[in-house]
Amino acid sequence: MSSGSDEVHIGHPSGSRACIHLHGAHLTSWKTATGQEQIFLSKEAVFKPPKAIRGGIPVCFPQFSDFGQLTQSHGFARNSRWSVFSREGDTVALKLTSADDNFLEKYGWEDSFSILIRYTISEQQLFTTLEVTNTGGKEMAYTMALHTYFKVEDITKARIEGLYRVGYLDSLDRREMKTDENPHISVTGEVDRIYLSTPPTVRIVDPIGKRVVMIEKFNLPDIVVWNPWVEKAKRTGDFGDEEYKEMLCVETGCIKPAIRLLPGTMWKAEQILTVINNGSVV
């Protein structure tokens, strides 16, 4: 493991490695033992705090999108500088607390908290654990998501499996509640959906990349599927015009309803990404 003033690198004996920025506790790269990059990072990404980094795994806390009282979309965790809490083997943990900045003055957030994120890599897996503690004297309500940008070789060929007949809020249609009747999700245009009460495991199938990414999650009931497609990609300053073709966001989180955490209690969740390389993936 190596570290600098702004980022931490972790490695595994198999050859897998990852890079995490202290700004946002933001993982920007994860390569498995084969050397294949699993995470999309825009070539136009701006590394100038407090701006959020485009791509990687942004940590949306204490609010996902506008699901909360803050005017700041996706909260402030991804815009804040975290500190290294611990390092051991192939693992790094980073921490952010309400004492680290004036979140009340900057964002209007009143509650006291600490949030710990732990990244661990193995040959073909990335484990992400989150622990949120209410350090204040009253109940704290929040929403959150791990806004993972997955790299795919061709968005028109990739698909998501495991959300058949799961209800979702369509953010492109006034968040109308709908149900997906397709056995798998293929992206053929802009998509922005919040799937609620989802199964514990879903899969991204990337046939051109000859891989499957299995997403396992614990205490993260909701999944967001997002791709900006052509026009929105062109309107986004820190995103390449053609980059929508090589990314797919599948974001695990707790969005609706919000988590309500009593004083002195902790909430814990985990996401496990497993890459299966298979030349016969279709």
Regions found by a protein language model. Name each.
Residues 8, 27, 92, 126-128, ...:
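Hydrophobic residues embedded in beta-strands of well-ordered beta-sheets
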Residues 123-126, 136:
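Beta-rich strand-turn-strand
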Residues 139-141, 149-224:
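Active-site/ligand-binding surface loops and adjacent short beta/alpha elements
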Residues 29-31, 138-144, 282:
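Short, hydrophobic/aromatic beta-strand segments
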Residues 20, 130-136, 275:
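Asparagine-centered strand-capping/turn motif at beta-strand->loop junctions
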Residues 71-123:
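Extended, loop-rich substrate-binding clefts of extracytoplasmic carbohydrate-active enzymes
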Residues 13-72:
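Acidic-aromatic substrate-binding/catalytic surfaces of carbohydrate-active enzymes
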Residues 1-16, 23, 33, 97-102, ...:
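Beta-strand-rich recognition/accessory modules
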